[in-house]
A protein has these predicted regions:
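A conserved regulatory-domain signal marking ACT and ACT-like small-molecule sensing domains
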Residues: 1-126
């Protein structure tokens, strides 16, 4: 899966315009994270079709500022689940650059080496 990052003006309706444009193009959003920094917001969207999402965003006047392949791992809704999921990555010396929850109790994880991270997680049965 791909995480697309956008920097949007912190104005009412901007995120609705972006997500509406993606919806009209048939792009399914599997996860979303955002935070305001001064006059702007940084938005991360987990999409099922990055190429179509980029094109739809561009048609609506939005620019993708970052695109990363990410891990989307199932995570239980219980105390310690996040620590247990991240521990194999830490033990393998993998830096985590991004996390947010996605649909259906899944965690999006941004790392420098996706293959190495998957190997570390799979070694623990994930």
């Amino acid at each position: 899966m791909k995480d697309l990052m956008f920097i949007l003006p912190y104005q009412a309706g901007t995120l609705a315009q972006l997500t509406g444009a993606l919806s009209e193009a048939g792009v399914s959003l599997q996860g979303c994270s955002g935070q305001q920094f001064g006059p702007e917001g940084i938005i991360h969207l987990l999409v099922d079709n990055a190429a179509e999402a980029r094109e739809a965003a561009a048609r609506a006047g939005f620019v993708v500022r970052g695109e990363h392949e990410v891990i989307v791992a199932d995570i239980e809704d219980r105390p310690g689940a996040l620590a247990g999921l991240l521990a194999p990555l830490a033990n393998a010396g993998i830096n985590v650059s991004l996390t947010y929850l996605a649909t259906r109790s899944r965690l999006v994880i941004g790392v420098d080496d996706v293959d190495q991270a998957w190997a570390a997680l799979r070694a623990t049965g994930r």
